[in-house]
């Protein structure tokens, strides 16, 4: 048994190690050698006055959202930090050809690059992944991050707006005399002065379209963050984005236009229908609800008024005036000769001159045509012949019932009363017949007064119709011109063709 165990042990020791095992052992020995005297808190500069160059790149994975109310942009990104640490260099030939190592981020010096304009107090990255160290001493770190950065929103042309949001990265504790920043590098080693977007993995936002994505290195004149004096460098990544307005066109602007059309056609609704005021107030309340719903989407700022709010206020003013003017039209429609006397200028303008220009034409009253009698009655008494002659040759209906002529003086109008009250010898009628004719004259006067009353009332109703039609065309013109002026102004608000003109 002892001999067998000895032979087994010799066989195990004599078996060659797998290449992976030798590699792991070589990596362990290399890491142990590199970090034997390594201090992660010491800046990797050969001399005190040397600057450590750090390149900062940004890969955008997703533009999550832009909260206009809180002026906050949420993004999912990958930072791309690269610098040189001379203490982490080696000769691959001396270490089984190992040319790179994966080391935990806590083990090496980091340039403490943070997002300065964060909006939630989280300056750091989301996950401290390993750094990749090459044999030349180049260190590359690509941590992912979910950032909420502040973004000043320009609301003037909302929802036809574009925004310029920035992400400002800098070394928080080192100034430019210790750490030199520059924009990220592309695979060829050239500076990439823009945000990198991988087309295969990028998730497009449904509300915003990225127009430009440049980056720029700036140097602040003096320490603006407090502490010791010195210059600080910052790498700023710009996201110039344009809103896709389809959602607001369908859900806000189109309903507002339809409600405005309802308010316009209030003036086409006859006053007798009794729904003019109800329809106007309904449109006004609906616009108020739209304004309240939109208030949650717009930033609470007094610097500018969004164009969509301007349009809603313009529409609300029109609808408010439609309510007021509907009251005016109803007041005109229900006037009568007992309460109001129509001025001469009102009659001239709204009855005679203005209607043809508005497409209105008042129908002419039809005159009753009475056939002339073709037979004569035989006289039966002495006075019957005179009576027969009177009824056969009766005056025309215009004499018994004078047509309404509101421009003719009352004294000049023919009147049956003067015919009755005239000299008896001119008529030669008995007293009984005169009493009958007097009664007929009284009824004629009553019918004439009623006809005058109805005619004057119809005049007021026609004036109300003309005013209604005038308001209809006025509102159509104002609504069309106002809508075009407001929204055509937004068509000229386009993102710049170049990010830095």
Curated annotation (Swiss-Prot):
GO biological process terms, semicolon-separated: behavioral response to nicotine; muscle cell development; neuromuscular synaptic transmission; postsynaptic membrane organization; regulation of membrane potential; skeletal muscle contraction
Task: Quote the biased-composition stretches of kind Basic and acidic residues, using this chain's numbering.
Answer: 363-375
The residues forming the signal peptide are: 1-23
Q: Where does this polypeptide localize?
A: Postsynaptic cell membrane; Cell membrane
Question: Which residues are on the Extracellular side of the membrane?
Answer: 24-244
Q: What are the GO MF terms of this UniProt record?
A: acetylcholine binding; acetylcholine receptor activity; acetylcholine-gated monoatomic cation-selective channel activity
Annotated region (Disordered), positions in chain: 362-382
InterPro entries on file:
Neur_chan_lig-bd, Neur_chan_lig-bd_sf, Neur_channel, Neuro-gated_channel_TM_sf, Neuro_actylchol_rec, Neurotrans-gated_channel_TM, Neurotransmitter_ion_chnl_CS, Nicotinic_acetylcholine_rcpt
The protein's job, in short, is: After binding acetylcholine, the AChR responds by an extensive change in conformation that affects all subunits and leads to opening of an ion-conducting channel across the plasma membrane.
Q: What is this protein called?
A: Acetylcholine receptor subunit beta
């Amino acid at each position: 048994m002892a001999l067998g165990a000895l032979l087994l042990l010799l066989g195990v020791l004599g078996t060659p190690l797998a290449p992976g095992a030798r590699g792991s052992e070589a990596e362990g020995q290399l890491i142990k050698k590199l970090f034997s005297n390594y201090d992660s808190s010491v800046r990797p500069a050969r001399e005190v006055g040397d600057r450590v160059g750090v390149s900062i790149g940004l890969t955008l994975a997703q533009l999550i959202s832009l909260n206009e109310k809180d002026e906050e942009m949420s993004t999912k990104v990958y930072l791309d930090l690269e610098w040189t640490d001379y203490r982490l260099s080696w000769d691959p030939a001396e270490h089984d050809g190992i040319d790179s190592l994966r080391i935990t981020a806590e083990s090496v010096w980091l340039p403490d690059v943070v997002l300065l304009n964060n909006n939630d107090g989280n300056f750091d990255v989301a996950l401290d992944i390993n750094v990749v160290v090459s044999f030349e001493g180049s260190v590359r770190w690509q941590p992912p991050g979910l950032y909420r950065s502040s973004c000043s929103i320009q609301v003037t042309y909302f929802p036809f707006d574009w925004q310029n949001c920035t992400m400002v990265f800098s070394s928080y504790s080192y100034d430019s005399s210790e750490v030199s920043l520059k924009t990220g590098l592309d695979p060829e080693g050239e500076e990439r002065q823009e945000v990198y977007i991988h087309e295969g993995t990028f998730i497009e936002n449904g509300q915003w379209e990225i127009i430009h994505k440049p980056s720029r290195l700036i140097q602040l004149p003096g320490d603006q963050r407090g502490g010791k004096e010195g210059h600080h460098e910052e790498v700023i990544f710009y996201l110039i984005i344009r809103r896709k307005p389809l959602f607001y066109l369908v859900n806000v602007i189109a309903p507002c236009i339809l409600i405005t059309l309802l308010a316009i056609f209030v003036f086409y609704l006859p006053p007798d229908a009794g729904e003019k005021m109800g329809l106007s107030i309904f449109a006004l309340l609906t616009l108020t609800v739209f304004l309240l719903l939109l208030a949650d989407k717009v930033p609470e700022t007094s610097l500018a008024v969004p164009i969509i709010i301007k349009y809603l206020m313009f529409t609300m003013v029109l609808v408010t005036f439609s309510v007021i003017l509907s009251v005016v039209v109803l007041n005109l429609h229900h006037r009568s000769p007992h309460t109001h006397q129509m001025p001469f200028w009102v009659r001239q303008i709204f009855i005679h001159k203005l209607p043809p220009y508005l497409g209105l034409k008042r129908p002419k009253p039809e005159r009753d045509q009475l056939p002339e009698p073709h037979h004569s009655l035989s006289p039966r008494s002495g006075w019957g012949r005179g009576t027969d002659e009177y009824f056969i040759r009766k005056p025309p209906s215009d004499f018994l019932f004078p047509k309404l002529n509101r421009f003719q003086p009352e004294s000049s109008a023919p009147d049956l009363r003067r015919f009755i009250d005239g000299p008896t010898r001119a008529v030669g009628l008995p007293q009984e017949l005169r009493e009958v004719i007097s009664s007929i004259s009284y009824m004629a006067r009553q019918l004439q007064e009623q006809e005058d009353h109805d005619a004057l009332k119809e005049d007021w109703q026609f004036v109300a119709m003309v005013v209604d039609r005038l308001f209809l065309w006025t509102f159509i013109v104002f609504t069309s011109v106002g809508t075009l002026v407001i929204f055509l102004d937004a068509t000229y608000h386009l993102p710049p063709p170049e990010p830095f003109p």
